[in-house]
Amino acid sequence: MHSITNFADLDLTKQYSDYLLWQFSERVELIKGFILKMSPAPSRKHQTVSQNLNYKIYSFFNNHSCNVFVAPFDVRLPIKSAKKDSTVVQPDICIICDENKLDDQGCNGAPDLIVEILSPKSSKHDVDTKFKLYQESGVKEYWIVETEERFVLVYSLENNIYIGQKPFSVGEIIQSKIFPEMKIPVVDVFHKI
């Protein structure tokens, strides 16, 4: 092992093996090797929307081979522009159809569909940072749920680029491009909030 004499030679980025050793009281994600502290406990609105969506999604996939998971659930993403095993996220909801991606630690690879429910403190991270991560890692579909304005954005991966559908608002039905039989009324997503 050689001596490090210059700050530029230090590797301050972390990997999944480091992540597994942490015992923080707060939840964190690892984004391209850098630690990102997550928001404290989600709001009641966030949790209600999460339960509503999870119920609808889980009911649809109950008789399918795909698996549905809710946070906290580690997803290790393959990011081409970062070191291997340097990105671990905890999406609000994710659907994984390839059993080979699942292990005892969570998901190792891009889920088929990820849902993020916006919170005031996480909206920039979910709309910007995670959008780019999910697109780069090959998540086929990404839903962003806006709880204050009550709409859902659906992005589908086409030629490695997310293409957005028009926002789905109350009175409309969310339709997945990758699971066309799954149709969820937006009013059901925001029930009881």
Segments (PLM) and residue ranges:
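Gly/Pro/Ser/Thr-rich low-complexity, intrinsically disordered segments predominantly at protein N-termini
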Residues: 1-193
